[in-house]
Amino acid sequence: MSAAAQKAKHYGFALATVYMCYFTYGIQALILSQNKVNFYTQWGITDPTQGSAAVSMAIAWMGFGKLVSVWIGGEFSDRIGRKKFAVAGAIAYIICFTLMLVVTDATMCYVAAFLSGAATSGFWDAALYPAAQEAEPKYAASGVIGIKAAVSVMGVIYPLFVAWFSAPEIWHVNIYLPIVLSVLCLIMTIITPFRYDDERATKAEGDSGMDEAQAEIQAAKDAMLKKPGVLVQVFTLLMAFICMFIMYGAQQYTKAFGMANLGLDEMGGAALASIYTVGSITAVFFWAVMMGKLRWNPLKVLLIDFAFSTLALALVLVVPNVAIVYVAIALLGFFAAGGALQTGLVVRQNYCPGPKGRNTGMYMTFMGVGATFLPFIVSAMTSAMGETGALYTMMGLLLAASVIGLLFCIYLANQSKKLFGYTINRKMD
């Protein structure tokens, strides 16, 4: 086998490990909302409104864990390397899922939720997003959007799995599953080589030249006609908040919206959540081809995502017909959850070149704000107006966020010619 082929195979396994970790994350993202009734019953709460508010608060603590950890994680991932952070994230996942299995009060579950958020963003996002981009730098956008594919596949499977094992005497199977997968992730992260770590080791052995990562950053800066302005810096970070705000709202509350606002049963709500995820999986492969093979500009993809997400959310709010909502939720999955968050990270790196761990940490910090803020206000609104009104109001907030994201994309598209000398319609190199 040629050296080039060996290198490709070597870091192909790194991508497989990244995707396995995010396949498991697909459960972490959904476990509280999908098992809502069984969780708050285990905590000793009998009132459904109070129970729903408590679960939303646990989800908020999960987001808070993301918020406080990811920026620091990104900085240390660049300094320490990808493997140590990936391994630490897997260990933390095993601990937090085990806590969720055994705790019998909401406060302790908030601790577990916080830990799971910190494990996801502070360790895995900080290490594995850069690792996906570094495995094959030319196809960084496709590598990163593949993360969304891994999450989305589990997003289809897990709600249906939960519906099958929702009975009180067997529902803990829904927690055993991520514990087993987390152990598998631990094994894979231990044995996986990562390009960034190998380059650091090579440099430490005496290579005094600029490493590939620094050379890539400098080349990107040199290719720009001028430095990005303050609004470009701010908008590319706020995009993370907006993408996460929309995606997290639909991901966490689609099932509850279907049951509370459309009158669906448990299986119908799970099916609605799965349709949302099917839309996202379809989009992942579609956009991977558009950006990987056809070399579409990631910002062009993001602009289209926001335009159609706005349309889908408007349909959900204006046409409360079950069939129409199913179609709209599928569209929302395709355009809002089909890699928009991951594509936004690539846009950030393109417009504001810098160390990938640092850029990932900054971007994911704003993502963490969205993941914290949304469930917190849903919890407060549920206590104030009941679940039905809270979820409808939340959909209105998602629509407003989508419109703002669309305006941000239009501004960045107008800046493309000034920064790069070409429009977003030109194929990427």
Question: PLM ranges: what are they?
Answer:
Residues 13-45, 250-255:
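Extracytoplasmic
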Residues 69-81, 166, 283-297, 382:
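Helix-to-loop junctions at the C-terminal end of transmembrane segments
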Residues 139, 143-197:
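Helix-loop-helix hairpin linking two adjacent transmembrane segments in secondary transporters
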Residues 350-385:
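A late C-terminal transmembrane helix in Major Facilitator Superfamily
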Residues 112-149:
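Cytoplasmic helix-loop-helix junction between adjacent transmembrane helices
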Residues 297-343:
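C-terminal transmembrane helical hairpin of 12-TM major facilitator-type secondary transporters
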Residues 68-104:
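Conserved MFS/SLC helix-loop-helix module at the cytosolic interface between two early adjacent transmembrane helices
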Residues 32-33, 229-277, 281:
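Extracytoplasmic gate region of multi-pass secondary transporters
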